[in-house]
Amino acid sequence: MKKEHVLHCQFSAWYPFFRGVTIKSVILPLPQNVKDYLLDDGTLVVSGRDDPPTHSQPDSDDEAEEIQWSDDENTATLTAPEFPEFATKVQEAINSLGGSVFPKLNWSAPRDAYWIAMNSSLKCKTLSDIFLLFKSSDFITRDFTQPFIHCTDDSPDPCIEYELVLRKWCELIPGAEFRCFVKENKLIGISQRDYTQYYDHISKQKEEIRRCIQDFFKKHIQYKFLDEDFVFDIYRDSRGKVWLIDFNPFGEVTDSLLFTWEELISENNLNGDFSEVDAQEQDSPAFRCTNSEVTVQPSPYLSYRLPKDFVDLSTGEDAHKLIDFLKLKRNQQEDD
């Protein structure tokens, strides 16, 4: 995998060519000061939201105690930086997409941080919703700091223009998402995306799903992407219509799900212990899904549920982060 392959999978590199078969989206350049803010791991203070009205007098003794909790004159007041011009553009884009969006950077979405949101979802309605997810996500940090981590070429890293991608929010059923692997412009493998769960309809409709994805690939994807080797994700809705979700590099940086990269690169044993019919259909991609006999696995995102910020909270090393987090939750509840 080379650096150019990674660049070709940036959202803005492929979206103009596949706009008609994917979810409506808006791409906004990410200002340098916003990037710096997102990479600053010193605090969970989140900007993008007006502070709630403050009372001139405390309503109770408890509130008075809270206000006077720290009178150390050396204690710094933590305030979130504001980006009014960028915030306006983001809110206009969100409104144009129906009021709710799925956010991501050039490559990654903050899927590992869904747990921190009030609704345990990546659904965002404001810039502060987006900032909370981004600042809590290792995936987003990796986009910023290690986009070419698995590339084999030694050329200098290209300059990246980072962008905020806002996708119209759609309620997608995890059991209808599939990852497709393409080698030399040939679809060689299809894997259930949410492989930690068993979905009865996938097992029963396997051949139909495979044919549907093959038809979509031949009509809309094959020979149209910038590389010969790549990975793409699709969603098949209840009517059987296929939607393109994303492109990823063909290599270790991308999760191979129910395949191994050794299998995909060599194309050996792709059908494995699957049906003889599959093995005989040499022109058909291998299709893998979680069988009912397989023990349901924990979500791969569970390991991301305790970021350092919360380890600091549990050990009492950073009380400011707890205050900031509780204030943010209170603001969200008041807005709701």
From Swiss-Prot:
Q: Which UniProt keywords apply?
A: ATP-binding, Chaperone, Cytoplasm, Magnesium, Metal-binding, Nucleotide-binding, Phosphoprotein
A Pfam family cross-referenced in the UniProt record is D123
Q: In which tissues is it expressed?
A: Widely expressed. Expressed in spleen, thymus, prostate, testis, ovary, small intestine, colon and leukocytes with the highest expression in testis.
* Entry's localization field: Cytoplasm
| GO molecular function annotation | ATP binding; magnesium ion binding; protein folding chaperone
- Sorted alphabetically, which InterPro entries does this protein's record hold? CDC123
Gene Ontology biological process: eukaryotic translation initiation factor 2 complex assembly
Residues that bind ATP: K104, W107, A109, R111, R167, K168, W169, C170, E177, R179, R193, D233, D246, N248
Would I find Magnesium among this entry's keywords?
A: yes
What does the entry list as the binding residues for Mg(2+)?
D246, N248
UniProt effect for mutating D246A: Severely disrupts assembly factor activity
| Source taxon at top rank | Eukaryota
Stretches that traverse the bilayer:
none
Q: Which sequence positions carry the modification called Phosphoserine? A: S60
Q: What's one GO-annotated cellular component?
A: cytoplasm
The record describes the protein's role as: ATP-dependent protein-folding chaperone for the eIF2 complex. Binds to the gamma subunit of the eIF2 complex which allows the subunit to assemble with the alpha and beta subunits.
Family affiliation: Belongs to the CDC123 family.
Self-association and partners: Interacts with the eIF2 complex gamma subunit EIF2S3 (via C-terminus); the interaction is direct. Interacts with the eIF2 complex alpha subunit EIF2S1. Interacts with the eIF2 complex beta subunit EIF2S2.
What is the name attached to this protein's record? Translation initiation factor eIF2 assembly protein
Name of the gene encoding the protein in the UniProt record: CDC123
